[in-house]
Design a protein with these regions (language model features):
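Helix-turn-helix
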Residues: 1-17, 21
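C-terminal peripheral helix-coil segments that are non-catalytic and often amphipathic
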Residues: 51, 55, 96, 100-107, ...
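Membrane-interface starts of transmembrane alpha-helices
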Residues: 112, 116-120
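Helical hydrophobic small-molecule/effector-binding pocket
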Residues: 47-74, 78, 124, 128-131, ...
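Short loop-to-helix capping motifs
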Residues: 14, 78-80
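Amphipathic alpha-helical packing segments from all-alpha helical-bundle domains
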Residues: 47, 58, 67, 71-73, ...
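Amphipathic alpha-helical linker/stalk segments
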Residues: 20-52, 60, 64, 103
């Protein structure tokens, strides 16, 4: 059966602990979904950067994920510790993963990217409009081809801006 509230809280500590555990689980699913970790060796940086954003967008526009994003926003308003935890283990962690990829490309001489953290922030800005639309619940019908065109165009501009002088 479905355990009692008391036994669930015994396991997770309290409501906050349970919510944190759910967030951790959802984050793991998210990382699997966007397969962030694995940049396959022969894969070009361009196709990797496009793939991550495409998978990211596909993930966040699913209705169950939209509902979860809104729930997280609601909960973090009331709990600054949770907000920090989610930021450190969510957005910041994803950004750091991309920053590492960019730093390596810089070291290998493939890109001119002396500030990979700033560049990673810029990179995720490519989806900012979509994220806000999802949060606000406006204009949620997203044309997949237009989204792909947008991502490819922006990644190309991003890479152009990181070419060696």
């Amino acid at each position: 059966g479905g355990g009692s509230k008391a036994s669930i809280y015994k396991y997770f500590g309290n409501k906050e602990g349970l919510f944190k555990a759910i967030c951790d689980y959802r984050r793991e699913q998210f990382y699997k979904d966007i397969s962030l970790a694995c940049m396959s060796e022969p894969e070009e940086l361009r196709s990797y950067l496009i793939r991550i954003l495409s998978n990211f967008l596909k993930h966040i526009i699913q209705p169950k994920n939209i509902a979860f994003i809104r729930l997280v926003l609601n909960q973090t308003q009331k709990d600054s510790t949770l907000a920090l935890y989610i930021h450190e283990n969510g957005a910041k962690m994803i950004q750091m993963t991309i920053a590492k990829v960019l730093a390596k490309a810089h070291e290998d001489g493939d890109l001119n990217c002396p500030h990979p953290n700033n560049s990673a922030m810029l990179y995720f800005g490519i989806l900012r409009d979509y994220e806000w639309r999802i949060i606000l619940g406006v204009d949620l019908v997203i044309n997949e081809q237009e989204a792909i065109n947008h991502i490819e165009y922006c990644v190309d501009r991003f890479l152009d801006g990181h070419q060696k002088p």
